[in-house]
Protein backbone atom coordinates (compact mmCIF):
# COMPACT_ATOMS: atom_id res chain seq x y z
CA UNK A 1 0.00 0.00 0.00
CA UNK A 2 1.27 3.46 -0.89
CA UNK A 3 2.44 5.52 2.06
CA UNK A 4 0.26 8.46 3.07
CA UNK A 5 1.50 11.57 4.86
CA UNK A 6 -0.98 13.72 6.81
CA UNK A 7 0.14 17.32 7.26
CA UNK A 8 -1.45 19.28 10.14
CA UNK A 9 -0.57 22.99 10.02
CA UNK A 10 -1.40 24.91 13.18
CA UNK A 11 -1.40 28.55 14.15
CA UNK A 12 -2.84 29.56 17.54
CA UNK A 13 -5.56 26.90 17.60
CA UNK A 14 -4.21 24.72 20.38
CA UNK A 15 -7.70 24.19 21.78
CA UNK A 16 -8.72 22.25 18.66
CA UNK A 17 -5.41 20.65 17.69
CA UNK A 18 -6.01 17.44 19.71
CA UNK A 19 -9.19 16.69 17.72
CA UNK A 20 -7.31 16.95 14.43
CA UNK A 21 -4.27 14.96 15.56
CA UNK A 22 -6.32 12.19 17.16
CA UNK A 23 -8.41 11.82 14.01
CA UNK A 24 -5.17 11.36 12.05
CA UNK A 25 -3.72 8.91 14.57
CA UNK A 26 -6.92 6.86 14.56
CA UNK A 27 -6.87 6.07 10.83
CA UNK A 28 -7.52 2.44 9.90
CA UNK A 29 -4.35 2.42 7.78
CA UNK A 30 -0.91 3.57 8.98
CA UNK A 31 0.03 7.13 8.02
CA UNK A 32 2.99 9.43 8.50
CA UNK A 33 1.81 12.38 10.61
CA UNK A 34 3.52 15.76 10.51
CA UNK A 35 2.48 18.73 12.66
CA UNK A 36 3.66 22.16 11.51
CA UNK A 37 3.61 24.92 14.14
CA UNK A 38 3.43 28.10 12.06
CA UNK A 39 4.89 30.46 14.66
CA UNK A 40 2.05 30.11 17.17
CA UNK A 41 2.05 32.44 20.16
CA UNK A 42 -0.33 30.39 22.32
CA UNK A 43 0.43 27.00 23.91
CA UNK A 44 0.40 25.08 20.61
CA UNK A 45 3.98 23.91 21.21
CA UNK A 46 3.07 22.39 24.57
CA UNK A 47 -0.03 20.68 23.15
CA UNK A 48 1.72 19.37 20.03
CA UNK A 49 4.51 17.78 22.04
CA UNK A 50 1.97 15.65 23.92
CA UNK A 51 1.43 13.56 20.78
CA UNK A 52 3.68 10.88 19.35
CA UNK A 53 3.86 11.85 15.68
CA UNK A 54 6.48 11.25 13.01
CA UNK A 55 7.65 14.84 12.67
CA UNK A 56 7.02 18.10 14.48
CA UNK A 57 8.14 21.24 12.63
CA UNK A 58 8.35 24.69 14.23
CA UNK A 59 8.75 27.63 11.86
CA UNK A 60 8.28 31.38 11.69
CA UNK A 61 4.75 32.49 10.89
CA UNK A 62 4.22 32.51 7.15
CA UNK A 63 0.56 31.67 6.68
CA UNK A 64 -1.36 28.50 5.91
CA UNK A 65 0.15 27.88 2.47
CA UNK A 66 3.65 28.28 3.85
CA UNK A 67 2.94 25.82 6.68
CA UNK A 68 1.44 23.27 4.30
CA UNK A 69 4.40 23.54 1.96
CA UNK A 70 6.86 23.14 4.84
CA UNK A 71 5.15 19.94 5.95
CA UNK A 72 4.80 18.48 2.47
CA UNK A 73 8.47 19.17 1.76
CA UNK A 74 9.40 16.90 4.68
CA UNK A 75 6.78 14.25 3.86
CA UNK A 76 7.92 10.84 2.65
CA UNK A 77 4.51 9.63 1.50
CA UNK A 78 3.47 9.18 -2.11
CA UNK A 79 0.06 10.58 -1.13
CA UNK A 80 -0.58 13.76 0.86
CA UNK A 81 -3.49 14.97 2.98
CA UNK A 82 -3.49 18.45 4.51
CA UNK A 83 -5.70 18.54 7.60
CA UNK A 84 -6.23 21.96 9.18
CA UNK A 85 -5.86 21.99 12.95
CA UNK A 86 -9.49 22.93 13.60
CA UNK A 87 -10.94 20.11 11.48
CA UNK A 88 -10.99 16.31 11.67
CA UNK A 89 -11.52 13.22 9.53
CA UNK A 90 -13.38 9.93 9.94
CA UNK A 91 -11.26 6.88 10.94
CA UNK A 92 -11.70 5.28 7.51
CA UNK A 93 -11.08 8.47 5.49
CA UNK A 94 -7.69 7.41 4.12
CA UNK A 95 -8.67 3.77 3.60
CA UNK A 96 -11.71 4.70 1.51
CA UNK A 97 -9.86 7.33 -0.52
CA UNK A 98 -7.07 4.91 -1.40
CA UNK A 99 -9.57 2.61 -3.12
CA UNK A 100 -9.56 5.14 -5.97
CA UNK A 101 -5.78 5.61 -6.14
CA UNK A 102 -5.23 3.67 -9.37
CA UNK A 103 -7.64 5.80 -11.42
CA UNK A 104 -7.43 9.26 -9.87
CA UNK A 105 -4.85 11.75 -8.62
CA UNK A 106 -6.98 13.79 -6.21
CA UNK A 107 -9.65 12.17 -4.05
CA UNK A 108 -12.10 14.09 -1.89
CA UNK A 109 -15.19 13.27 0.18
CA UNK A 110 -18.38 14.86 1.37
CA UNK A 111 -18.17 17.50 4.09
CA UNK A 112 -20.03 17.65 7.40
CA UNK A 113 -19.84 20.98 9.19
CA UNK A 114 -19.86 21.21 12.98
CA UNK A 115 -19.47 23.94 15.56
CA UNK A 116 -21.49 26.97 14.41
CA UNK A 117 -23.18 25.01 11.61
CA UNK A 118 -24.42 21.51 10.86
CA UNK A 119 -24.63 21.84 7.08
CA UNK A 120 -23.61 18.97 4.83
CA UNK A 121 -22.07 19.15 1.37
CA UNK A 122 -21.61 16.54 -1.34
CA UNK A 123 -19.63 17.39 -4.45
CA UNK A 124 -19.68 16.52 -8.14
CA UNK A 125 -18.30 13.00 -8.64
CA UNK A 126 -15.65 13.80 -11.26
CA UNK A 127 -15.16 17.57 -11.54
CA UNK A 128 -12.97 18.94 -14.33
CA UNK A 129 -10.85 22.07 -14.74
CA UNK A 130 -13.86 23.84 -16.29
CA UNK A 131 -15.95 23.02 -13.22
CA UNK A 132 -13.27 24.43 -10.91
CA UNK A 133 -13.26 27.74 -12.77
CA UNK A 134 -16.94 28.10 -11.88
CA UNK A 135 -16.62 27.07 -8.24
CA UNK A 136 -14.44 25.09 -5.87
CA UNK A 137 -15.49 21.47 -6.36
CA UNK A 138 -13.82 19.73 -3.41
CA UNK A 139 -12.87 20.70 0.11
CA UNK A 140 -9.41 21.64 1.36
CA UNK A 141 -8.92 18.26 3.00
CA UNK A 142 -8.58 15.97 -0.03
CA UNK A 143 -5.98 13.28 -0.70
CA UNK A 144 -3.56 13.96 -3.57
CA UNK A 145 -0.36 12.61 -5.07
CA UNK A 146 2.78 14.37 -3.85
CA UNK A 147 3.79 14.47 -7.51
CA UNK A 148 1.13 17.16 -8.04
CA UNK A 149 2.69 19.43 -5.42
CA UNK A 150 6.09 18.96 -7.03
CA UNK A 151 4.73 19.60 -10.53
CA UNK A 152 2.60 22.72 -10.00
CA UNK A 153 4.84 24.41 -7.44
CA UNK A 154 2.99 23.83 -4.18
CA UNK A 155 0.50 26.09 -2.45
CA UNK A 156 0.72 29.80 -3.33
CA UNK A 157 2.28 31.47 -0.28
CA UNK A 158 1.12 34.90 -1.44
CA UNK A 159 -2.51 33.87 -0.81
CA UNK A 160 -2.99 34.70 2.86
CA UNK A 161 -6.67 35.70 2.72
CA UNK A 162 -8.00 32.27 1.75
CA UNK A 163 -8.95 30.25 -1.37
CA UNK A 164 -5.40 28.84 -1.46
CA UNK A 165 -6.83 25.33 -1.73
CA UNK A 166 -9.17 26.31 -4.58
CA UNK A 167 -6.21 27.87 -6.37
CA UNK A 168 -4.23 24.66 -5.84
CA UNK A 169 -6.99 22.46 -7.30
CA UNK A 170 -7.41 24.85 -10.24
CA UNK A 171 -3.75 24.57 -11.16
CA UNK A 172 -3.75 20.81 -10.62
CA UNK A 173 -6.73 20.15 -12.87
CA UNK A 174 -5.38 22.51 -15.51
CA UNK A 175 -2.23 20.35 -15.50
CA UNK A 176 -4.42 17.34 -16.29
CA UNK A 177 -4.71 15.63 -12.92
CA UNK A 178 -7.97 13.76 -12.40
CA UNK A 179 -10.36 14.25 -9.47
CA UNK A 180 -12.89 11.95 -7.81
CA UNK A 181 -15.12 12.58 -4.81
CA UNK A 182 -16.66 9.96 -2.54
CA UNK A 183 -20.34 10.62 -1.69
CA UNK A 184 -19.82 10.04 2.03
CA UNK A 185 -19.36 12.55 4.85
CA UNK A 186 -15.82 11.64 5.92
CA UNK A 187 -14.43 15.16 6.45
CA UNK A 188 -15.60 17.28 9.38
CA UNK A 189 -15.19 21.03 8.93
CA UNK A 190 -15.36 23.16 12.05
CA UNK A 191 -17.36 26.33 11.34
CA UNK A 192 -16.40 29.23 13.57
CA UNK A 193 -15.89 32.98 13.39
CA UNK A 194 -12.15 32.67 12.82
CA UNK A 195 -12.51 30.35 9.81
CA UNK A 196 -10.43 31.43 6.82
CA UNK A 197 -13.46 30.92 4.61
CA UNK A 198 -15.13 33.84 6.38
CA UNK A 199 -12.18 36.06 5.45
CA UNK A 200 -12.00 34.76 1.89
CA UNK A 201 -15.65 35.50 1.18
CA UNK A 202 -15.06 39.16 2.05
CA UNK A 203 -12.26 39.29 -0.54
CA UNK A 204 -13.91 37.01 -3.11
CA UNK A 205 -13.60 39.26 -6.16
CA UNK A 206 -9.95 40.16 -5.72
CA UNK A 207 -9.00 36.56 -4.92
CA UNK A 208 -10.84 35.26 -7.98
CA UNK A 209 -9.16 37.83 -10.19
CA UNK A 210 -5.76 36.83 -8.82
CA UNK A 211 -6.35 33.09 -9.27
CA UNK A 212 -7.64 33.41 -12.82
CA UNK A 213 -4.78 35.73 -13.80
CA UNK A 214 -2.33 32.89 -13.20
CA UNK A 215 -4.04 30.37 -15.48
Residue ranges, per PLM feature:
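Conserved donor NDP-sugar-binding/catalytic core segment of glycosyltransferases
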Residues: 92-121
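Glycine-rich, basic loop-to-helix element that forms the pyrophosphate-binding segment
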Residues: 59-75
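Short, acidic, metal-binding catalytic loop of nucleotide-sugar glycosyltransferases
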Residues: 22-31
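Acidic helix N-cap motif at the loop->helix transition within catalytic regions
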Residues: 18, 42-50, 88, 92
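Short aromatic/hydrophobic "clamp" motif used to bind/position activated sugar donors
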Residues: 80
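A conserved acidic beta->alpha catalytic loop
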Residues: 23, 37-46, 84
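Catalytic beta-strand/loop signature of glycosyltransferases that borders the donor
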Residues: 110, 158, 179-186
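Acidic donor-binding loop at a coil-to-helix junction in glycosyltransferase catalytic cores
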Residues: 161-168
Amino acid sequence: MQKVSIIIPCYNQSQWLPDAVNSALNQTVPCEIIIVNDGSTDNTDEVAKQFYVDKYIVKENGGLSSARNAGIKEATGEWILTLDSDDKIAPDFIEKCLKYKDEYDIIGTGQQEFGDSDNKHLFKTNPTFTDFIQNNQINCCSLFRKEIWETIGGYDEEMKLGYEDWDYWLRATKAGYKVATIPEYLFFYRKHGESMVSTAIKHHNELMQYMLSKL
